[in-house]
């Protein structure tokens, strides 16, 4: 299971380091101190992950087993690539048998077993390129996409929710029956139309706040489990569940 990191690391660095006063603004210095002293950042370096976000996925998987049995995975908003690193391992993806496709408009350094597309997911050609890259029907669609923040919470929420909606629509179009969809969202309410669509197409829908998400962050994750398939026009399922986890 994914365990909470300890307060020290093997390099001897201790939590609580201060950043020397330079020309950095106070807010930038506080962010840098928090980043340096973040135990998940330190653990990511020790375990070879590109970002602390790896532990969010691992923590969610510990409880919900969304990676179990996955044979092909698509990672949206993948930079710098920690989720794709995990996906490559669980699918046994190799350069000769690619089973993971990742997309981001930012550059991503190569990851063994991952086909990387440097492209905006909102580009009309992106869905077809992803499906060609992954080489088959995915069991899991991951989205860590978030719009650049403006500092205006309502605007940031609306923009990120749009990305979540586009990702959800893509997942419903491409997932294998029984597959799962996981996407970043922000606190502030998920649009009813999106929740209704997910509950029509998946057996269970949950909001999750992993312990590895910073406590002050408005970030949450929307998990839709057990895709019902595309063989019939979806109807509202009274048994579909929706819940929120801490």
Curated annotation (Swiss-Prot):
Task: Give the SUPFAM superfamilies listed for this entry.
Answer: S-adenosyl-L-methionine-dependent methyltransferases
Q: Give the catalytic activity.
A: uridine(2552) in 23S rRNA + S-adenosyl-L-methionine = 2'-O-methyluridine(2552) in 23S rRNA + S-adenosyl-L-homocysteine + H(+)
Q: Where primarily located?
A: cytoplasm
UniProt keyword list: Cytoplasm, Methyltransferase, rRNA processing, S-adenosyl-L-methionine, Transferase
UniProt subcellular location: Cytoplasm
Mind telling me which InterPro entries this protein's record contains? RNA_methyltr_RlmE, RNA_MeTrfase_FtsJ_dom, rRNA-MeTfrase_E, SAM-dependent_MTases_sf
Q: What is this protein called?
A: Ribosomal RNA large subunit methyltransferase E
| Protein species of origin | Agrobacterium fabrum (strain C58 / ATCC 33970) (Agrobacterium tumefaciens (strain C58))
